Amino acid sequence: VDSTQLESSSFTVNLTNHNFQFSADAISYSDSATSEFAGSDVNSHNYHSLATTSQFLPELAIIYEDQDILAINKPAGIVTHPSGSHYSDSLSNQVASYFRSKGEPTKVRSIGRLDKETSGILLFARNQTAAARLQNQREEGISEKTYLAAVSGFMPVDEDGAFHRISVPLAPDPDNRLKMVVSTDGTLPGSKHAETLYSVLKSTGPDVAAPASLVMLRLKTGRTHQIRVHMASLGHPLLGDSLYCLSDISNPFSRAALHAWKLKFQLPFSIDEAASDTRASMHHDKNAKKEISLEAPLPEDFKKFYETIF
């Protein structure tokens, strides 16, 4: 890949029968929406007393916003919700501060969550109705989130863009409360069905010193560490993953190499609903009930990985 291309706001991965565009300002609309994702409940928190954030946190990277939703490109290394030692420096605290700066209520409703080490798109609802409708889209398979992962080992490229299915239950690791494990027969305590789709976009040759692959993934269920555990179960753990990647595997990442790359969903209000609310109609008169496609530009570690490895 041309280095000048990587330094621009977008770059393309060209493969046989593939043309993957990584764009910093990719927002597009269409009339239909199809997907396969069943997720967890809306995470709703009121951070009125916590609507201040550390001056050391990066500025919010807003991908898209209107009166009902806010889409953020979350950096790696920031937790989604406050807890323990991250009481006031979570992404939700930042969002609460942003809402307050706009004169809005500081109740934060995230549609799903991302692990601390995971970068990429995270969606927030600005009101209860939007939150409920967006969550329903996840549960009914209308919305679709696509991830990119850099994994250890050579994997044959799927030149035809085909997806492979991993359908193996996951359960809490009985020996390590921080980890999840595969529960092949589903008998471990806390076992839950988990299903992941993946397609290999690019791979090194199998004979290089430290083979690696770039994989695109979609979730049909939303379990803790699902992508990390499923890929590790195939013998291809995420590079940089201190929980599931063997220490002797060479990796260029200082965190688990996972990026929430793309998100497709429907705007939560219809044209008629928007028209009845002048606040909403300012934003939804053309795009209501349309599918919106968002893309989070790749972080520097992914760009460097691609440029160096491929």
Provide a role label for each language-model segment.
Residues V1-F310:
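RNA pseudouridine synthases
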